[in-house]
Regions:
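A membrane-interface helix-boundary motif in multi-pass transporters
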Residues: 1, 201-231
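C-terminal membrane-cytosol helix-exit motif in multi-pass small-molecule transporters
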Residues: 1-18, 238-243
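Juxtamembrane intracellular "pre-TM" segments in multi-pass secondary transporters
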Residues: 14-49, 255
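Short amphipathic helix-loop junctions that connect adjacent transmembrane helices
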Residues: 64-87
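Helix-to-loop junctions at the C-terminal end of transmembrane segments
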Residues: 102-115, 201
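Structural signature of the two symmetry-related core transmembrane helices
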Residues: 118-133
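Intracellular juxtamembrane helix-capping segments at the cytosolic ends
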Residues: 156-170
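Loop-to-transmembrane helix entry/capping segments in MFS-fold secondary transporters
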Residues: 171-184
């Protein structure tokens, strides 16, 4: 992280051509993003908000329970994994990280070249297929295979949706949308997602485990990935509407 920060200090340049936000009334600015007229004027931005809200909700259906699922439902032991951390693995680790960074850069260039129309739906497909596959994998080895499309789709879809939100946010009103952004990015997903996951795990749990607090809890079950996949499919709805409006265009942004 430190190395990436140092590299970014010298390689990333802020745009100096942006429009400065004007000082306004605090209370008016606070409710700005909730105004129906603002929602209508920036319809693509709010469609992107809905898409990322559904995406993050799908993630929160399974993510809070993932480590517990691996440990108690699949019998995965973190100590066993540490046994594979040998000297050659440590030597190879930096090269793997460099390769991942290169892949991210290439994905960014690919998005710029062919646009979001195709890659967005590819990302949704990868993420959803990975979730469906994970719901049928009942050993750690098989789960690892399903994790490849799952987390590849997760990373790509996150990049795509975040860049879409950025593209549709008016430059001179960026701060005015940060509050409403956090509602869609964090508040709703972190309430709804874990609630769905908890209900599914209680309904289909194969047993219980004793947590660090000494209390008995339901074991997370594979069905939570299926529930997450169903939520992930809903991301298609705002994305299809965005595509019809022209996902690579931001003509409805009002400044």
């Amino acid at each position: 992280v430190i190395v990436c920060g140092i590299l970014g200090l010298f390689t990333l340049k802020d745009s100096r051509s942006g429009v400065h936000e004007k000082n306004g009334n605090y209370w008016k600015d606070l409710i700005y993003g909730f105004k129906p007229s603002v929602v209508k004027e920036n319809s693509k931005l709010y469609l992107a908000f809905i898409a990322i809200c559904l995406f993050q909700t799908a993630v929160q259906v399974f993510f809070p329970y993932l480590l517990i699922y691996l440990q108690h439902s699949l019998g995965f032991n973190i100590e066993d994994l540490l046994g594979y951390v040998t000297k050659p693995v440590l030597i190879a680790a930096p090269f793997v990280i460099i390769a991942l960074v290169a892949v991210i850069v290439l994905v960014g260039k690919l998005i710029d070249k062919i646009g979001k129309n195709i890659l967005l739906f590819v990302a949704i497909a990868l993420f959803t297929v990975g979730l469906f596959a994970a719901s049928f994998m009942h050993t750690a080895g098989k789960f690892a295979l399903s994790a490849i499309p799952l987390f590849a789709g997760y990373g790509l879809l996150g990049i795509m949706l975040n860049s879409t939100v950025r593209d549709y946010t008016p430059e001179d009103k960026t701060g005015l949308f940060q509050g409403i952004r956090m509602i869609f990015f964090v508040l709703i997903p972190m309430i709804v997602g874990p609630s769905i996951g908890d209900r599914v795990c209680k309904a289909y749990a194969g047993g219980t485990y004793v947590g660090d607090d000494g209390l008995s809890n339901y074991e997370p079950c594979a069905q939570m990935f299926l529930a997450a996949a169903i939520v992930a499919l809903l991301v298609l709805i705002p994305c299809i509407i965005l595509r019809k409006k022209g996902i690579n265009k931001n003509t409805d942004i009002k400044e």
